[in-house]
Amino acid sequence: LLGRCKVKSNRFNGPCLTDTHCSTVCRGEGYKGGDCHGLRRRCMCLC
């Protein structure tokens, strides 16, 4: 999905194991949602 803005979550700690948890944390930060991304499994929020 080209053109999607993603930023690393400020509040999520540790490896991102489930997209659901990441999305919940991101919504708490004011973003639209989020998912686990990359080899390091970082929580990335959707702008």
Curated annotation (Swiss-Prot):
Disulfide bonds join 5-47, 16-36, 22-43, 26-45. It comes from the Eukaryota. Pfam families: Gamma-thionin. The keyword Disulfide bond applies. GO terms for biological process: defense response to bacterium; defense response to fungus; killing of cells of another organism. Keywords: Antibiotic, Antimicrobial, Disulfide bond, Fungicide, Plant defense. InterPro entries: Defensin_plant (IPR008176), Scorpion_toxin-like (IPR003614), Scorpion_toxin-like_sf (IPR036574). Fabatins have antibacterial activity against Gram-positive and Gram-negative bacteria. High activity against P.aeruginosa. No activity against S.cerevisiae and C.albicans. Belongs to the DEFL family. This is Defensin-like protein 2. It comes from Vicia faba (Broad bean).
